[in-house]
Amino acid sequence: MNKNKIIVFDTTLRDGEQSPGASMNTAEKVELAIQLEKLGVDVIEAGFAAASPGDFDAIERICGAVSKIRVCSLARAIEKDIKAAGESIKSAKFKRIHTFIATSPIHMEYKLKLSPDDVIKKAINSIKYAKTFCDDVEFSCEDAGRSEISFIKEIVEAAINAGATTINLPDTVGYRLPSEMSYMIGELVKFVGDRAVISSHCHDDLGMSVANTIACIKAGARQIECTINGLGERAGNTALEEVVMAIKTRSDVFAPLYTDINFKEIYHSSRLVATITGIEPQPNKAIVGKNAFAHESGIHQDGVLKHKETYEIMRAEDIGLEKNSIVLGKHSGSHAFRDKLVSLGYNLSEDELANVFEKFKILADAKKEIFDDDLRELMTDELVKIPCAFEIIALSSSECNKGHASAALTLKHNDEILKDSALGNGVVDAIFKTIDRISGIKGNLKDYQVRAVSQGKDAQAKVTVKVLFENSSTIIGHGLDTDTLMATAKAYIGALNSYISMKQ
């Protein structure tokens, strides 16, 4: 075991997806897993195999899509969960099962209704069963932050003897202070020694997840569990980008500790998560917020122009955020287009290149100046493919009196051309009602967001919708177009197609 390396365990695909409205389909999960491999994380928690057939399928597909990263499935300390986890990761080159049980008095008494001895027995049995599927087994003491240290040591001893290779101590409800997390981790590091890796998993309910994770590292934890953009249920999880950049930027404090993160993939990873989930980092978010490297104060601007380090402790280029220069136009050829995509980290087959180049030429005809962010959105739209049950052929709309509007749409469905129109309270409402009429499937819009992808009056609009259909969880749809209304229709159609694909 390398005592200087910090193992980065990313749980965006599992814990991050539990953030309200952040559900991802299988294609999106696979694309994100591929990006996390490029980012250089060591372990990805690809999902909770027993939760649903969709989760199981996504984990299986991720195992086939990555080759360098360790793929992990979460499982409760229940035999059927562990069996599902083991079967879902069996094709992975590197695999892990992560099993857990609550150890705090309040959880054992009210949730599990088990005695401490019974909890230990369940932990032992689950770890031994998990070891029949793979050698690498992680055990978590759920709600360790509110557990008694003496009991944590007792169950950890039993877990290691049963075969656990990593011991995770989560602050499940984000309750602990850095000094308290440091004490707990320090005690377990001394207790466990070299017998297992000690891991931290912090939540941000009191805004201290990153500070707590840093404290855990300083106390001896050698695995950190985190998510891109700090995505997660309630107030979120430890933000991966913040911790790894702290280790890099403050090497004077952390050396010789290090991670294997490819820092130049941080920004792209952040944008991909934001695009897929529709959850944008707040503008002043550390590292990846749009204002993270912006300076408005005249004094600050003057200082940065004279020497960047006067007010910048790291460079935007360090995280892969290059100057958003004009890169291509309608006269650009396929070779220049391919070279630019390669520089942005995309390697396409000839068929993929031909398909996306055709879309690029259409965009270039509508938009004079093409920026890096335009290409990133175009590629995300191309790589995260959803079967198209419905496709937009044409859209027209008109404003009526007193805020009312009408929309007319022509859609293609199974080689059949369908047309209809509807009135609504504004054009957006009219578009959605028309799609509902044509498809025969009614959706309930829960959220609607629109933003400009890049700069300029002809910037593409990126529309994200969150829709509830019959017997579905929230479905996310994205639309990209220089026409905001067309982007709106594409986003709703995208959500509809995802819903139909999930049902099938």
From Swiss-Prot:
Domain of life: Bacteria
Chief location bin: cytoplasm
Family to which this protein belongs: Belongs to the alpha-IPM synthase/homocitrate synthase family. LeuA type 1 subfamily.
Pathway annotation: Amino-acid biosynthesis; L-leucine biosynthesis; L-leucine from 3-methyl-2-oxobutanoate: step 1/4
Catalytic activity: 3-methyl-2-oxobutanoate + acetyl-CoA + H2O = (2S)-2-isopropylmalate + CoA + H(+)
GO molecular function ontology, one term from the record: 2-isopropylmalate synthase activity
EC number(s) per entry: 2.3.3.13
Region ranges (Regulatory domain): 391-504
Residues that bind Mn(2+): D15, H201, H203, N237
Gene name as annotated: leuA
Protein's name according to its UniProt entry: 2-isopropylmalate synthase
